Amino acid sequence: VLLGNMGRGGRSVFALDVSNTASFGETNVLWEMPTTDPDLGQAAGRVEVMLAEDNNWYAVFANGVNSDNQNAGLFVVNLSSGIVERKIMADDGGDFANGLMRIALADTDGNGKVDAVYGGDYVGNLWKFNLSG
């Protein structure tokens, strides 16, 4: 699976099946985030893959800048279905354009599964998103 985004070129995050590149086409698109989600901006950070506490695999990414709602947030998307399982928005309390830019995954209890994500937003805040529960 190849995960990517449009960066500053648009509001899109996608997953592609690249197991057989000799016959690559439309059927290789596993899913694409809808550009109509008001919390999805121009996501320029990496789309990360995580094994979560529930033993499922997810794509995790920062929402990026210029979303309609102008807040920083984290998306957790089921890797195989493309369904948004969790969307956690940070309450920055400001009246300014913001967005989560880059993230780092953490296994804080050493069990091989991600239970926290750290991310920096456009205005310099560092956020911790607890995914353990």
Feature roles, as predicted:
Residues V1-G133:
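Extracytoplasmic/lumenal domain signature
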